[in-house]
Structure formats: structure tokens, C-alpha cells
């Protein structure tokens, strides 16, 4: 298992020490973290717009009224969060579906427990896109052949999505040169010409647009209609030992998703509490969708593309992985 986790983390956890939101205790179980009827749970998240409902739900008391207190810690991507959850560093984590399917294909004990975020399903109006700097001669995904394209994690959901955009545009994805960069480092790298294109998500997408960048493809839309991009998950051990905490987390997160979907202005404000997005750029952020349930058909499409890209050691069992 240790070897599997090391592989998932690609050599390092990449977990930032910055605790966003409420501060929490160590990596103890919920029993040890419980005080005065409140259970503190550590959640591994990514500092992107996707997780805004969790911060907003904490502010609105959706978790506290169920006896939960969230301690959020940021990481670069889902691939870094999976080992943290399985090892007990986090009780819950936010991860894209490809990372979860990769983990399960390696027999890592993960279980998705509640929906996370979905694409808007509208090309040109999604929260993630392939972008090129102002004045770039690149006009379509086909022209990314031989070019350097940044993704937040190699051999994962965004690389798969970019590959699909290149295929759909008539290009050869095997000729694209992928490089790994954190989302918040992409605007400067793109503007400085260190990369030719970047697959960015909000709020970094709004930042690159403010620098004059242009979208050339909505890769998440290219993968599948209304793609379920990510979900919140736990380890199978934690789910079995702490069913009450898992149920409370599911309920509070579901309430948070529904509230976020109906209150976009409050979502934008919540984003400022855990990212460095300038106030002037905030209004330009394209929000994703936060549906109550995952879209299984879209996850199956993502699974097929991941298999095509050679990401899985065995076929992921979606019946076991999904709630």
C-alpha cells in the first residue's frame, strides 16, 4: 500500500501547510478530535472555485448545526489529496474523478461520498478552458501539436480533457508536450511565454483572461455533456468506522452545494477567502454547476478516455466507487 500511495503522490504529497478556514487538530480520528459535541474533520481541498460551497457552507452553519467543524488544507490536485485521505491525514478530500478512478484501479481504498462539481456543459462558457496568451498564433486545439501545454497534474483529468479537445479538432494528442504547473502559477507562465497554452480553471481562468488570454477549447465540455468533474471522498476504512460522521458530512455538503448553486454572489465572495483573486477580476469568474447528484454517464465517458490514455491498471469499479 505504501508503494501505491507514493505512486499516486508522484513522489511527493504537494500538500501546502496553509490551513484555510478554521484551524484544526492533528490527524486523529473523529473521536479524538471531538470536543463539546463537535467533531473536527480535516478536508483536503484545492484552492479553486470548485470547493467554494464547502467554505460557504461552513460560514452558513450547515456543518456546525450537524456537529461538524471543517479544517481545510490545500493541495495542488486530487492526486496529492488521495494519499492524505487514505493515510488518515485527512478524513475527507476533494478530488477529480480521474484521480479517484486511478486510485481504485490500484486497489487504493477510496469511496466517493457526495457530489463535488460539474461542468456548465456550455462551450465557451465553462469554468475550465484551454487558453493561449494575447496575440498567440494558436487558434484551435489542433494547433497544440508540438506545443507546451500546462496542466495542474500530469496524466490526470485535465491532460485527458486536453487530449480529447485535440482529437476532436482533428489533431494528434500524442504530439502535445504536457508540463505540470499549479493553477495559480499558470497566468504568469502563460503571460511570460514559458508555456504555449494552459488548461486553467477558475479563478485562474478569469486572471488569464484579464491579461488578454483567449480560450481555444472548453475541454471539460469536450469530454462529456454536463461532466461530473470531481467529488468529495473518504477512505473505505473511515466510512466503515465512522458512518455517522460520513452521513453528516454528506448532508451538510449537499446543503452547501444547493445553496451555492442558488447564490452566485455569495460564492464569489467566498472564493476571496481562500484565493488571491483581485477584487476587480472577481465578477468575471465563470461559476461551475453544483448539482446534487453525479452524472454517471459522464463519469463513464471520462473512464473510457482515461483507459484510452493508459491511466488505469485495471478497470475502475464505479458501482463500488460511487455513493
Where are the language model's segments positioned?
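Short, glycine-/small- and polar/acidic-enriched structural segments
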Residues: 27-168, 180, 226
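Secondary-structure end/capping motifs
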Residues: 239-311
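Bacterial N-terminal signal peptides that target proteins for export
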Residues: 1-8
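C-terminal motif of bacterial Sec signal peptides marking the signal peptidase cleavage site
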Residues: 15-19
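Pocket-lining segment of extracytoplasmic ligand-binding domains
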Residues: 98, 179, 184-270
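Bacterial signal peptide processing site
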Residues: 21-24
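A ligand-binding cleft/hinge motif common to bilobed small-molecule-binding domains
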Residues: 94-108, 163, 196-214, 305, ...
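Conserved C-terminal helix/tail region of periplasmic/extracytoplasmic solute-binding proteins
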Residues: 307-323
